[in-house]
Amino acid sequence: MKIFFFIFAALILLAQIFQARTAIHRALICKRMEGHCEAECLTFEVKIGGCRAELAPFCCKNRKKH
């Protein structure tokens, strides 16, 4: 019975590690697109994707003036 709880706890930890890795990867993609991760984009910015982090879900970039 103890081994069941140990395996269950290990699976929960692994799930959290993979989520963190994905969030870091998305933040790097946002940086490559010359954006930044924010909780909300400002009025003069456009949403170009998602960072999927808890505190900064949006990838924002300044609008280009034509």
Curated annotation (Swiss-Prot):
One GO cellular component term of this record is: extracellular region
Keywords annotated in UniProt: Antibiotic, Antimicrobial, Defensin, Disulfide bond, Secreted, Signal
- Pfam families in UniProt: Defensin_beta_2
Signal peptide segment = 1-22
Q: List the disulfide bonds.
A: C37-C51, C41-C60
Localization terms from the record: Secreted
Q: What is its main location?
A: secreted
Gene Ontology terms: biological process: defense response to bacterium; innate immune response
**Could you tell me what this protein does?**
Has antibacterial activity.
Q: Which family does it belong to?
A: Belongs to the beta-defensin family.
Protein name stated in the entry: Beta-defensin 107A
